[in-house]
A protein has these predicted regions:
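Short cytoplasmic-facing helical segments at TM-TM junctions of multi-pass membrane proteins
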Residues: 118-143, 226-229
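Final/C-terminal transmembrane alpha-helix of multipass membrane proteins
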Residues: 229, 235-252
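Hydrophobic alpha-helical transmembrane segments of multi-pass membrane transport/permease proteins
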Residues: 56-71, 250
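Start (N-cap) of specific transmembrane helices in multi-pass transporter permeases
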Residues: 136-157, 232, 236
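Short, membrane-interfacial amphipathic segments enriched in basic
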Residues: 1-42, 218-223
């Protein structure tokens, strides 16, 4: 009997959290016009979140490009296709690794920062104080951060892919000795702007919505204690990372089936 009661309590808590999340998401989407009219707040968040993650995104992209070029060259060399190295590096980064790895790094860096910021504001009763002063905290605090994250992640993903391609060129052309003309011409001829780059942009936007919303929701729902905020930041990384990987599979399957 106790097991059934605990199970019912867990299901009820899960459904209540799901309902709160759905209401908050709908509210944030509905604030698009209001937040865009006060774009300065959104711009500040894009600047903050972008600067917060730019260094780790750029360095990670460079080393991913190094590894892709090394692995790709020795694999293609077996089949006499080493001139296609540029195409392999570009497609791998633009289609998959750029959006996915950028989103995972964004979740660990900027996502935890958002969760901790909102959680500490809740613990310090700043959100409650704003309510008492007739200032909507969702509109004033959460909304600009939500749209700022959605704008920042595609830009960071583009930086990751560009730096990764540069890293692939450095290893493939300067270190290994692949012909530079073949490297760039294969890339230029084989990468489709709408199908490949467009799909990568769509993925990065979806991941931006997912990671930013998870981070804000966890901070908004965090228990107003130091331990509660700590658990919320940890949960942000876990939930956002799993959501990104799951959505990547779904989006890839949909895009290749069209």
């Amino acid at each position: 009997m106790k097991f059934i009661a605990n199970l019912g309590f867990a299901v009820r808590s899960y459904l209540a959290g799901l309902g709160l999340g759905a209401r908050l998401f709908i509210r944030l989407i509905g604030l698009f016009g209001s937040n865009m009219r006060r774009f300065g707040l959104v711009r500040d968040q894009v600047h903050f979140l972008g600067n917060y993650s730019l260094a780790i995104i750029a360095v990670s992209g460079l080393f991913v490009g190094f590894v892709l070029s090394l692995q790709g060259y020795y694999t293609l060399q077996r089949y006499g296709s080493s001139e296609a190295l540029g195409l392999l590096v570009a497609l791998s980064l633009v289609r998959e690794l750029g959006p996915v790895v950028s989103a995972l790094l964004f979740a660990g860096r900027a996502g935890t920062s958002l969760t901790a910021e909102i959680g500490l504001m809740k613990a310090g009763e700043q959100l409650s104080a704003m309510d008492m002063m007739a200032v909507d905290p969702v509109r004033r605090i959460l909304g600009p951060r939500f749209w700022g994250g959605i704008i920042a992640l595609p830009l960071l993903s583009a930086v990751f892919s560009a730096v990764g391609i540069l890293g692939g060129w450095m290893v493939g052309v300067l270190m290994i000795g692949v012909d530079a003309g073949s490297f760039w011409s294969q890339m230029q001829g084989g990468v489709d702007v709408w199908k490949d780059v467009g799909n990568g942009v769509v993925k990065s936007i979806v991941f931006g919505v997912t990671v930013t919303f998870v981070a804000l929701l966890q901070g908004y729902e965090a228990q107003p204690t130091p331990e509660g905020v700590s658990r919320a930041t940890t949960k942000t990384v876990v939930v956002a990372s799993l959501a990104v990987l799951g959505l990547d599979f779904i989006l890839t399957a949909m895009m290749f089936s069209i």
